């Protein structure tokens, strides 16, 4: 033990060392420290006690264990009984534990905002860790608790304690891996430069009417110390941008008269109806739906969900027609037809496959026709250019053959457009949804324009062919 080892080094007899080993913690009681120290100072003045008072104020939890371990003090404590020593030991242990618990409580912190010069000086003081520099930073609060005077290196700055828009968590770490929360920071001490008047952070607008003064004084006092910005530049004016109160628009008198309060009282029945419709949708074998436009909602009757059975042929045909409509609109080639094929007969499956094959063949034929038409137009244009340069030596037979081929291809393309337009007309008859009708009407209008253009091109080529045949 420490006290047992210190006694021989100071030249004390072995008897004093044994006495200290029996009751090493007796000097920890604060009451006995004062009395024994005085006795030791009066009886044995030769023991040096200069550095001891300096170390007694270092920490808060070792206050009662810093008595000078002198032999005279140990001899003067031979008289107390063993039970009294144990009681004093328990009391001192409890006191030291309470002091340690108080030291680990949550701290009270605030942010100190200083001008650049003073901030640099405070940062230098903190990093130096010199105890002699601790007097260069002082903060004196006024009795109201919201105003203060901050003194940094003999420079006094007026300061105001303001409330931040939100709470900031303060953390500390020792190894830069594990963080411990120390406080919740919600206030900031803002220091203004020396000689500059400190403006309030948020000046409320207070009405001067006699009836409003009493109500607005409390709000004005609260808003007086509210800081409307955050601590970083992106949070400028964040109290109004992010944390402002939502304004409620008051309806006009005419709107209040038009409000039907029965709609609000019937909300439970509406919820029951919605649940019933959802249950019916879940139990249905197949469901029909349509996209309803808000403008035409009054003209269209909502069809809702209709549960059907495989025995009803009309609904089966209707579902197939809907499938054909969506396939035509999205350009699908029959890859998503598994659900429809399971509910149709074998004959319907064969018909669908034949239709898909025809659609695929028509699309392929259209692509080939377009490519050949473009090539023939380029070839004919080149021949026209050669004919204009060498009119006498040019043979008309090659030009007439090219014109005839181009007329044939354009007539074939015209037939395809005509068939497509007829199919769009059939789809328009089957579809009941106005949105789909509008889509197919637009497609049909484009096909009619293409049909007119092809007819004009064919007529122009026929006139050119007549001219070359006459020559």
Swiss-Prot record:
> What main location does UniProt list?
nucleus
Matching entries from CDD domains are given as: TAF7
| Acidic residues bias spans | 347-377
Residue positions where Phosphoserine is found in the record:
199
Q: What's a Pfam family in this record? A: TAFII55_N
The domain of life is: Eukaryota
Between which residues do disulfide bridges form?
A: none
Gene deletion effect: Reduced sperm count and motility.
Renumbered to this chain, region (Disordered) spans: 1-84, 192-211, 328-377
Q: Where in the cell is it found?
A: Nucleus; Cytoplasm
Alphabetically ordered keywords of this record = Coiled coil, Cytoplasm, Developmental protein, Differentiation, Nucleus, Phosphoprotein, Spermatogenesis, Transcription, Transcription regulation
Signal peptide range in chain numbering:
none
This entry carries the following GO cellular component terms, namely: cytoplasm; male germ cell nucleus; nucleus; transcription factor TFIID complex
What are the recorded Gene Ontology BP terms? flagellated sperm motility; spermatid development; transcription initiation at RNA polymerase II promoter
From the UniProt record, list the coiled-coil ranges: 358-433
Q: Which family does it belong to?
A: Belongs to the TAF7 family.
Subunit-level organization: TFIID is composed of TATA binding protein (TBP) and a number of TBP-associated factors (TAFs). TAF7L may replace TAF7 in a spermatogenesis-specific form of TFIID. Interacts with TBP; the interaction occurs in a sub-population of cells (pachytene and haploid round spermatids) and is developmentally regulated through differential intracellular localization of the two proteins. Interacts with TAF1.
Q: What does this protein do?
A: Probably functions as a spermatogenesis-specific component of the DNA-binding general transcription factor complex TFIID, a multimeric protein complex that plays a central role in mediating promoter responses to various activators and repressors. May play a role in spermatogenesis.
Q: What name does the UniProt record give this protein?
A: Transcription initiation factor TFIID subunit 7-like
């Amino acid at each position: 033990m420490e006290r047992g080892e210190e006694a021989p080094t100071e030249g004390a007899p072995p008897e004093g060392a044994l006495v200290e080993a029996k009751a090493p913690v007796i000097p920890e009681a604060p009451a006995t420290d004062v009395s024994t120290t005085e006795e030791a100072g009066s009886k044995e003045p030769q023991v040096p006690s200069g550095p001891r008072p300096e170390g007694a104020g270092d920490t808060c939890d070792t206050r009662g264990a810093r008595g000078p371990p002198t032999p005279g003090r140990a001899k003067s404590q031979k008289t107390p009984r063993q039970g009294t020593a144990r009681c004093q030991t328990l009391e001192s242990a409890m006191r030291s534990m309470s002091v340690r618990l108080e030291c680990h409580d949550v701290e009270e912190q605030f942010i100190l905002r200083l001008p650049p010069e003073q901030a640099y000086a405070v940062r230098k003081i903190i990093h130096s860790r010199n105890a002699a520099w601790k007097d260069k930073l002082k903060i004196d609060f006024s009795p109201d608790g919201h105003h203060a005077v901050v003194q940094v290196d003999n420079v006094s700055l007026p300061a105001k304690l303001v409330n931040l828009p939100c709470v900031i968590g303060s953390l500390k770490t020792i190894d830069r891996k594990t963080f411990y929360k120390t406080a919740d920071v919600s206030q900031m001490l803002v220091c203004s430069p020396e000689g500059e008047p400190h403006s309030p952070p948020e000046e409320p607008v207070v009405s001067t009417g006699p009836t409003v003064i009493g109500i607005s004084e409390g709000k004005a006092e609260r808003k007086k110390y509210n800081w409307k910005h955050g601590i970083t530049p992106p949070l400028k004016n964040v109290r109004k941008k992010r944390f402002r109160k939502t304004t409620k628009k008051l309806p006009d008198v005419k709107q209040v008269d038009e409000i039907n309060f029965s709609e609000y009282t019937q909300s439970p029945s509406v919820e029951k109806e919605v649940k019933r419709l959802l249950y019916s949708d879940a139990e249905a074998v197949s469901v029909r739906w349509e996209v309803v436009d808000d403008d035409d909602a009054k003209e269209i009757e909502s069809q809702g969900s209709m549960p059907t059975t495989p025995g009803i042929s009309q609904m089966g045909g209707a579902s197939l027609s809907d499938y054909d409509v969506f396939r035509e609109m999205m350009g699908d080639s029959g890859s998503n037809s598994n659900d429809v094929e399971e509910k149709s007969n074998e004959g319907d499956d064969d018909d669908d496959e034949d239709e898909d094959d025809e659609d695929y063949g028509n699309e392929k034929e259209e692509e080939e026709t377009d490519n050949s038409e473009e090539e023939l137009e380029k070839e004919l244009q080149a021949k026209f250019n050669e004919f204009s340069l060498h009119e006498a030596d040019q043979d008309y037979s090659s030009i007439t053959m090219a014109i005839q081929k181009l007329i044939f291809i354009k007539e074939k393309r015209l037939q395809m457009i005509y068939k497509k337009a007829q199919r769009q007309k059939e789809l328009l008859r089957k579809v009941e949804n106005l949105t789909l009708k509008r889509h197919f009407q637009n497609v049909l209008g484009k096909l009619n324009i293409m049909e007119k253009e092809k007819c004009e091109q064919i007529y122009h080529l026929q006139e050119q062919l007549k001219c070359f045949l006459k020559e």
